């Protein structure tokens, strides 16, 4: 066939998913040609029918690890080698080739998809396009965005997958991995043992159920590769095998085979019901059935998930590179809202978040190599060492401004106060410098309007990741953020508003001329909104005029009014309590522990106590001048109210002294260590150990010994857990409570006489409740 002959056929539709089918390098020209990749695209035409399409692209060597957090370079030959290993293993092998080099696979997945998008020309999955396919080669050459399509709001068609595969894995191998890595997740340890040693139980049953809008199947197997012992529904109602003959570069002809779904392009799985291993067992069975018959090039089958990270990850997801070609989404619950959240994240990021982590939005960018900083920003940053007026803002605030005007605990009243926060602040600055990144800009714009809450962690991850991936861009954003803080501070001061505390993307302060006796809450809020608008204009002017940035009006920074307040109490830069007595709305209390439900309950009571203290002073001071006599009366009543508060709290927690979830804390990374061997006998519980662990402290049999940490979520519900050491959990909480009350007593003491001290030791008095 003459490779120069092209016969195009055009078809309207959209792309639902894209996955690498196979990859290779051109012999003898590795550096020049990069990595050749054959993509399988699951598409839906304008008639609503799913169609398979294939595209060949070349990922240049310099792009392969461009946004890798760990730097360095992996050759195209290495990528081709790992792909070959993932498509040539035994049919019953587990798809765990990425185990041990998951970052390399994430780079491959992200960079290849980014290249595919740029080469073909589509904007995103589910956006309407016109496909141009060469009938001579069978390859998709181009996708032309269809801005005038009648149906421009395509969404995923979801089905539900439920599976149960209680696989037994050699406990000694899991234990060895756990001990060797000093704190690895047990899910990682189990996968490592599974990859090395396989199943220890040859007759592991598998129960699978798939529900789609128009089909239902259920299969029950006594063992994975034996005929089903229970059968319901036809697999042909779910998907069909499709083969295509393709002609690749170099006039090389191959035959490919895919499972083409009939009525879905996403399968959702409830993570509380179906483990990742159960999904993999199901897909492994289908892979063996689909490719047991020779005559075609087998696709890659490789798993990427949080279990592949030795320390686990904060988020749950499921991704396979290659087979099966459709998307598998993890949901927190089977509820419709949870499914909607998962599909929204998938659509807005083409499935790259959270799979590729901090690199996700870099792979969604319209460029390969990141563009340089805008010239004026670069020039200003270069002047920092000589410009001493700005040195502190960039040196002392190297992660963003954190400052307060107070050197000691302070209480404020009589004047209206307000708290402000920039929406999606740091990503907004990035988009102001690089407005061509439309995918990121769309999400940032939605966050400004309080939309796409599910992608807030993605934006936080993106900005934090810049420090590792593009440190010069990160420093520039911090520089601009600090300049904005100075601009806002000056603008606010000119409007009669003094900023008290500024923390990165938000601040609170006091209106110097708005007296709470003369101005109502609605009027104060109007003043706050006017101030926000004035600051927004000043910041926009800074970005456009002084920094020379050119961005659309829709992306201008938004300063949100968090609330207006009549009273404030602050004891440190990050610790404050703000309350509106006129409206009696819930106070804004920050800077106290909240890691457990017990901590959150005490925080709520502390916030209420601070409201009570305010009301006591308002009552005592009414029509009087605040003096040391009134202070002593007030302080005595506050101390008494504090006693009632902690007694009420102890009564509350006493009823929950046997409830692990109430006391449970998330283990900090610095605390992570190897799990005791006693946890290794519950395999089905270990599969869930890929997130930060929840711990409780239980009493030591030795009354003089420290409490023992128990990973209670890794134990079955029938496990007998020793008595919870409630006192150990309460000690830091009560310490914070007592400290803040004493700061409050100091803050209200405007006199030379010593402050009354809250000297109670609540735990010493009530420890008997928890013995």
From Swiss-Prot:
Protein name, as recorded: DNA helicase/primase complex-associated protein
Instruction: Give the record's family classification.
Output: Belongs to the herpesviridae HEPA family.
Lineage, top-rank taxon, reads: Viruses
Key word Transferase present: yes
GO MF annotation: an example: transferase activity
Q: Subunit composition? A: Associates with the primase and the helicase to form the helicase-primase complex. Interacts with the origin-binding protein. Interacts with the polymerase catalytic subunit.
Task: Name the species this protein comes from.
Answer: Varicella-zoster virus (strain Dumas) (HHV-3)
Q: Pfam families per the record? A: Herpes_HEPA
Biological role stated in the UniProt entry: Component of the helicase/primase complex. Unwinds the DNA at the replication forks and generates single-stranded DNA for both leading and lagging strand synthesis. The primase synthesizes short RNA primers on the lagging strand that the polymerase presumably elongates using dNTPs. The primase-associated factor has no known catalytic activity in the complex and may serve to facilitate the formation of the replisome by directly interacting with the origin-binding protein and the polymerase.
**Swiss-Prot/TrEMBL keywords:** DNA replication, Host nucleus, Transferase
Q: Where does it localize?
A: Host nucleus
Q: What GO biological process terms are annotated to this protein in UniProt?
A: DNA replication; viral genome replication
InterPro entries listed in its UniProt record: HSV_HEPA (IPR004996)
HAMAP family linked: HSV_HEPA (MF_04010)
Q: Which GO terms describe its cellular component?
A: host cell nucleus
């Amino acid at each position: 066939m003459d490779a120069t002959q092209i016969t195009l056929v055009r078809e309207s539709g959209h792309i639902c998913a894209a996955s690498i089918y196979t990859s290779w390098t051109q012999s003898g020209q590795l550096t020049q040609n990069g990595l050749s990749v054959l993509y399988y695209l699951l598409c839906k035409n304008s008639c609503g029918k799913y169609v398979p399409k294939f595209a060949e692209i070349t990922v240049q060597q310099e792009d392969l690890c461009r946004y890798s957090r760990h730097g360095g370079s992996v050759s195209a030959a290495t990528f081709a080698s790992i792909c070959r290993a993932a498509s040539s293993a035994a049919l019953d092998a587990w798809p765990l080739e990425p185990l041990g080099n998951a970052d390399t696979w994430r780079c491959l997945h992200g960079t290849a998809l980014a290249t595919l998008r740029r080469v073909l020309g589509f904007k995103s999955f589910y956006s309407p396009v016109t496909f141009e396919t060469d009938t001579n080669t069978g390859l998709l050459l181009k996708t032309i965005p269809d801005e005038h399509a009648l149906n421009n709001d395509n969404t995923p068609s979801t089905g539900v997958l439920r599976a149960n595969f209680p696989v037994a894995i050699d406990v000694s191998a899991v234990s060895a991995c756990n001990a060797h890595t000093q704190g690895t997740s047990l899910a990682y340890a189990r996968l490592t043992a599974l990859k090395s040693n396989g199943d220890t139980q040859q007759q592991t049953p598998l129960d699978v159920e798939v529900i789609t809008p128009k089909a239902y199947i259920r299969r029950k197997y006594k063992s994975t590769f034996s005929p089903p012992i229970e059968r319901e529904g036809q697999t042909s109602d779910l998907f069909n095998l499709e083969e295509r003959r393709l002609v690749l570069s170099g006039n090389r002809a191959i035959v490919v085979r895919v499972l083409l779904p009939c009525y879905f392009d996403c399968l959702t799985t409830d993570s509380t019901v179906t483990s990742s291993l159960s999904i993999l067992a199901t897909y492994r069975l289908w892979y063996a059935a689909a490719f047991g018959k020779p005559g075609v090039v087998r696709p890659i089958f490789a798993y990427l998930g949080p279990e592949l990270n030795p320390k686990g990850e904060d988020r749950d997801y499921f991704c396979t590179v290659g087979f099966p070609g459709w998307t598998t989404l993890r949901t927190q619950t089977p509820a419709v809202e949870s499914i909607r959240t998962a599909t929204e994240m998938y659509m807005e990021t083409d499935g790259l978040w959270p799979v590729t982590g901090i690199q996700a939005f870099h792979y969604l960018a319209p460029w390969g190599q990141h563009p340089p900083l805008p010239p004026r920003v670069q020039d200003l940053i270069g002047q920092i060492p000589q410009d001493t007026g700005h040195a502190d803002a960039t040196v002392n605030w190297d992660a963003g401004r954190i400052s307060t005007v107070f050197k000691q605990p302070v209480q404020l009243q009589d004047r209206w106060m307000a708290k402000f926060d920039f929406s999606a602040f740091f990503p907004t600055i990035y988009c102001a410098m690089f407005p061509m990144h439309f995918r990121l800009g769309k999400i940032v714009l939605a966050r400004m309007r309080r939309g796409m809450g599910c992608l807030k962690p993605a934006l936080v991850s993106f900005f934090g990741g810049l420090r590792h991936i593009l440190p010069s861009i990160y420093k520039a954003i911090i520089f601009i953020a600090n300049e904005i803080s100075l601009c806002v501070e000056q603008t606010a001061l000119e409007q009669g508003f003094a900023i008290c505390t500024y923390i990165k993307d938000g601040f609170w302060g006091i209106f110097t001329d708005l007296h709470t006796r003369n101005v109502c809450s609605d009027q104060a809020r109007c003043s706050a909104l006017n101030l926000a608008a004035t600051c927004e204009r000043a910041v926009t002017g800074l970005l456009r005029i002084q920094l020379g940035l050119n961005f659309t009006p829709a992306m201008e920074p938004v300063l949100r009014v968090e609330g207006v307040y009549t009273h404030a109490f602050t004891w440190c830069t990050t610790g404050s309590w703000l309350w509106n007595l006129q409206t009696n709305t819930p106070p804004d209390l920050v800077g106290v522990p909240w890691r457990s439900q017990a901590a959150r309950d005490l925080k709520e009571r502390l916030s209420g106590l601070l409201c009570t203290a305010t009301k006591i002073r308002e009552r005592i001071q009414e029509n009087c001048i605040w003096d040391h006599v009134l202070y002593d009366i007030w302080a005595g009543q506050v101390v008494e109210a504090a006693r009632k508060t902690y007694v009420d709290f102890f009564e509350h927690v006493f009823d929950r002294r046997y409830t692990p979830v109430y006391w449970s804390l998330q283990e900090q990374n610095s605390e992570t260590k190897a799990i005791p061997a006693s946890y290794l006998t519950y395999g089905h519980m270990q599969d869930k150990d890929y997130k930060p662990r929840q711990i409780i402290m239980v009493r030591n049999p030795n009354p003089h010994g420290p409490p023992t940490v128990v990973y209670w979520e890794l134990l079955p519900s029938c496990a007998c857990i020793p008595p919870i050491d409630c006192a150990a959990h309460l000690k830091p909480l009560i310490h914070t409570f007592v400290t803040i009350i004493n700061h409050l007593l100091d803050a209200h003491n405007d006199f030379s006489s010593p402050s009354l001290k809250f000297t109670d030791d609540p735990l010493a008095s009530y420890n008997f409740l928890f013995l």
